[in-house]
Amino acid sequence: MNYGYVRVSSKEQNEQRQMIALAEFGIVEKNIYMDKQSGKDFDRPRYKRLVKKLRPGDLLVIQSIDRLGRNYGEILEQWRVITKEKHAAIVVLDMPLLDTRQSRDLTGTLIADIVLQLLSYVAQTEREFIR
C-alpha cells in the first residue's frame, strides 16, 4: 500500500503544495495522513497512526525530509523504524537520493544514509534558527 504524510507547523499554514505533490505521485487522498503541528518531536497523532499501519512492502511518500520532522536524532530513529523494523520504503520527493526503493546495495545505502544525516541536521538547525 502507498501512503503519504503531510505536516504543516500551524493551522494557518497551507498544506496544498504537499497534497498536490503526493497526488501527482499517485497517492490517493484517503491514504494521506496529515498533522498540523510542529515537527520538533514525533508526538503527532496521525503520524503515529500511519506508522502503526505500515506493513512490509508498503511505501511512505513525503515531500521533504523536514516534513517528517525537525529533530535530527528523532528523524534518524523514525527512518530506522520505518525501513528496518517495519520493512517499508520511503520516498522523499524533493531528494531523489532518499528513495529507499532504489540502490539497496551497500553503496546506495551508504549514500542515502549520508544524505539523510545531512538533511536531518539541516532540518534541526533550521528549527533552532526559527526559534
Task: Tell where the protein language model's regions lie, with residue ranges.
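Alpha-helical scaffold elements adjacent to nucleotide-binding pockets in ATP/GTP-utilizing enzyme cores
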Residues: 21, 74-81, 114
